[in-house]
Amino acid sequence: MARKTPIERYRNIGISAHIDAGKTTTTERILFYTGVNHKIGEVHDGAATMDWMEQEQERGITITSAATTAFWKGMGNNYPEHRINIIDTPGHVDFTIEVERSMRVLDGACMVYCAVGGVQPQSETVWRQANKYKVPRLAFVNKMDRTGANFFKVYDQLKLRLKANPVPVVVPIGAEENFKGVVDLLKMKAIIWDEASQGTKFDYVDIPAELADTCQEWREKMVEAAAEASEDLMNKYLEEGDLPEADIVKALRDRTIACEIQPMLCGTAFKNKGVQRMLDAVIDFLPSPVDIPPVKGELESGEAAERQASDEEKFSSLAFKIMTDPFVGQLIFFRVYSGVVNSGDTLLNSTKGKKERLGRILQMHANQREEIKEVRAGDIAAAVGLKEATTGDTLCDPAHPIVLERMVFPEPVISQAVEPKTKADQEKMGLALNRLAQEDPSFRVQTDEESGQTIISGMGELHLEILVDRMKREFGVEATVGKPQVAYRETIRSTAKDVDGKFVKQSGGRGQYGHAVITLEPNEQGKGYEFFDEIKGGVIPREYIPAVDKGIQDTLKSGVLAGFPVVDVKVHLTFGSYHDVDSNENAFRMAGSMAFKEAMRRANPVVLEPMMAVEVETPEDYMGNVMGDLSGRRGIVQGMEDMVGGGKIVRAEVPLSEMFGYSTSLRSLTQGRATYTMEFKHYAEAPKNVADAIISAKSK
């Protein structure tokens, strides 16, 4: 089967934005204009084609990035047919993992901003991620019909907040309810869309007189930006005072792909204006798979290698998303970087070192699907029948193994206990949690050995809430979620010398007799428990000494203050006595345990709490609020530094118990413009008032 669309005409793009910037509506319009779905789905009534999980439709936010293929010949049929693969990315901070994951497989991105709200918090996070993966991008200012819409204000915010270099290629005609269309600065013509045909037809008309000066000014800025692409162009521009359209497009394209500039457009997806011109810009300015550097990887020998985006190259692809589909089971979304693969071929999962047969290949359109026989370099598709693959795995030709760069996923920051509501839910819950953890690498499941509870951990409170919700909807498991819990520990601060432990039972016949004397002292942090046998002259027979050690180890599981595990102590067994007839292992275990409990009471026991290393990235204006709040949470600020592209990073150590509800309060403190990460650092002694509260809570 030959290739339908030459790879130069592929555009793999992501559409990403802050919640409510109108991203889903924008994607919907793209699908409508590219002729894929003929009735437009509106988010307002929960019918958008891309948002296909039930919760998304209820919450009106996009959670999972669905991948869709569309075709475009240009607004006025002025291009050969291009193939656009769109990855829809979520705009909520608790789903940053999804955004990060889709950035990895994109060639370009279209950032959607609200003409009223401008650059919002998540936009900053997404922008940083796009910088990290060097993704070329366009900016689309949506909702130009809303009260308070201001295209030029958003232009200023892009420069100021994101340190971006936006280059408008259109300017709006009117704003708010008077928004009519846009002026195309390349053609210097106004574009007015026909409302009756939902924007599928349009006319080029003369620029309204009142906009002539504005358009001239912005055209000059655009041509200057193009001229900076090369010395030759700059000289041509200086000589002639202008540049031909073809030169401008090529120069802006080169600079966009080099991440030096971001072409900027505007419109209102809801009113069918501007998205069509933005699609043309995707073709004009965003890269095809051959315009960006070849994907890098590692061979079995550990050598670095590259794979060119070509059908002739050996097959390599990356699995970037797993979804459970109610009809076909598990779908693995993958991006083909090089080569060709057919359904039925055997692939090597080089990340895990396992071979698997590729079953069916599906081309996804939001939630409809078309079965295809092969995929080629540049394609994004979904595979059915791969059992082993998880997010971030490389799937490649077994004869030519390569591991593409691995994705790095953040550690979860919040944990909660989940309990099934009924016995019947018990087994299903284990299955459901494992399936969800497979789909989402930032979600972990473990069993707490101390309490026997199942503990789930994730990226934020909303993240866990949605996973528990999915468990109920997709797997029919009802579960109750506990309050987030903290794992405390106990240790000692001083030494207790020569403490006796004597276990004696004489009750006629054979009795029990064990006697051990120990010295207990603090150990270095992180060293755990150590036992030293210092018995001289056989006062305790050799065979009973391990029993004393075992008795102490049993007692370590539950300390004397509040029953938390005891850490970092040294025990010296120094003396004892025995009875020829009555002594046995059990008696010495009991003696060891009694001696340890008594010694611990005397050795100034304390409660330890987990301390977290917290990093907050915040705009400078909110710095004071953030620092004040961290100190209020018993945090110790350890340092600050400037962020590349504005803003500050605050590093602090904060007790885990004080961090519950933090993502919510940080959001309100900084109007959602700050993000934070936290990971476990070490255990530290809890202040007396805190320790007392913990002990009394535990004893209830």
UniProtKB/Swiss-Prot annotation:
One of its GO terms (cellular component) is cytoplasm. Catalyzes the GTP-dependent ribosomal translocation step during translation elongation. During this step, the ribosome changes from the pre-translocational (PRE) to the post-translocational (POST) state as the newly formed A-site-bound peptidyl-tRNA and P-site-bound deacylated tRNA move to the P and E sites, respectively. Catalyzes the coordinated movement of the two tRNA molecules, the mRNA and conformational changes in the ribosome. The keyword Metal-binding does not apply. This is Elongation factor G 2. Residues 8-290 form the tr-type G domain. Keywords: Cytoplasm, Elongation factor, GTP-binding, Nucleotide-binding, Protein biosynthesis. One of its GO terms (molecular function) is GTPase activity. It comes from Burkholderia mallei (strain ATCC 23344). Gene3D superfamilies: 3.30.230.10, 3.30.70.240, Elongation Factor G (Translational Gtpase), domain 3, P-loop containing nucleotide triphosphate hydrolases, Translation factors. It comes from the Bacteria. One of its GO terms (biological process) is ribosome disassembly. PROSITE patterns: G_TR_1, G_TR_2. InterPro entries: EFG_II, EFG_III, EFG_III/V, EFG_IV, EFG_V, EFG_V-like, EFTu-like_2, G_TR_CS. GTP binds at residues 17-24, 88-92, 142-145. It is found in: Cytoplasm. Belongs to the TRAFAC class translation factor GTPase superfamily. Classic translation factor GTPase family. EF-G/EF-2 subfamily. The keyword DNA damage does not apply.
